[in-house]
Amino acid sequence: EVGDWSSDVCSSDLNNVLENFSRMAEVLEVKIDDFVFTHQTHTTNIRRAGLKDRGNGITAALDYSDIDGLITDTPGVVLSAFFADCIPLYFADPVHKAVGLAHSGWKGTLDKIGAVLIAKMGEEFGTRPEDLIAGIEPRICQDCYEVSEEVAKKFKEVFITDKENAGFKALNPADILRPGRKGHRG
């Protein structure tokens, strides 16, 4: 066990927040100023982060808004976001030494933020979907999260083609594989 990083992380006491991120930075062997945060508003907007962005959202004010995904090929830039019941999507392109992180809530999932981020990595770095390593964090399950009929209908229209494909759990893995990935592990 390396420490409690979540105590007071969402409190209004900035000193507690900075202390918790300093602890995490120490364990990761980076500086707190290396973190770059999203400005999550449930969009599919992706931003390329570089050295000038380090500290944004933690030790410096964000100079951008409405960003739910970050990509970089710059060593020393630590992509970061906040998650509760939304789904973290991680991407690594070992060929072009680039990474991506997306915050995928129900709106981002519906709008296929995973595919949008993969396309952006292709535009910026030459990433090919078949070269990507993708990871999905654990997420809230359908037993613990109920959606309205209106939201369920939107998902059915976009994702469900037959009874076998039904289920919120399968949407993000399928979304990631659609842009051309040959397979996955796990």
Where are these regions (language model features)?
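Active-site microenvironment for binding and transforming phosphate-containing groups
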Residues: S6-G186
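Short, exposed "boundary/linker" segments that immediately precede the start
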Residues: E1-D4
